[in-house]
């Protein structure tokens, strides 16, 4: 007799520790997606979504790599279910990308002259005015800041 597949996801042990924070960030994400973008530039409408996505990924990264409070099974579950960005976390593990805000800032095809975003320039090399990234609104994510 074939097994019956259910749509219910089985959560690994330790999920109850991170669930309230994940649910809170999901609610913020829904609110940011439904928020009106009247008076904002086209690119500015997506900035809150990028910030919340970064915050959620950083939360899971810190729990697993820095504080070591969650198991590998729970960490992999969060990545597989889309609670954290696997590619962004992979970049955070490399030297020089520890504070990276989003993957679009390091993709050379999205920028003039095949370079990275202005937010990747260290603060001591910039001019005095504050510059925000066009993609995600970051003001600086270079590791030397």
Swiss-Prot record:
Similarity remark: Belongs to the BUD31 (G10) family.
Protein name, entry field: Protein BUD31 homolog 1
Subcellular location: Nucleus
Source organism per UniProt: Oryza sativa subsp. japonica
Main location: nucleus
Biological processes, Gene Ontology terms: mRNA splicing, via spliceosome
InterPro entries: BUD31 (IPR001748), BUD31/G10-rel_CS (IPR018230)
Key words of the record: Nucleus
GO CC term (a single one): spliceosomal complex
Source superkingdom: Eukaryota
């Amino acid at each position: 007799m074939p097994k019956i597949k259910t749509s219910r996801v089985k959560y690994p042990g330790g999920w109850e520790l991170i669930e309230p924070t994940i649910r809170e960030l999901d609610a913020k994400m829904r609110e940011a997606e439904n928020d009106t973008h009247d008076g904002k530039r086209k690119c500015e409408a997506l900035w809150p979504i990028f910030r919340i996505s970064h915050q959620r990924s950083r939360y899971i990264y810190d729990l697993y790599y820095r504080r070591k409070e969650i198991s590998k099974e729970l960490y992999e579950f969060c990545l597989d279910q889309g609670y954290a960005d696997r590619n962004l976390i992979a970049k955070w593990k490399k030297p020089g990308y520890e504070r990276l805000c989003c993957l679009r800032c390091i993709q050379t095809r999205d920028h003039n002259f095949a370079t990275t975003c202005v937010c990747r320039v260290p603060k001591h090399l910039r001019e005095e005015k504050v510059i925000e990234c066009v993609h995600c609104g970051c003001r600086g994510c270079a590791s030397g800041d």
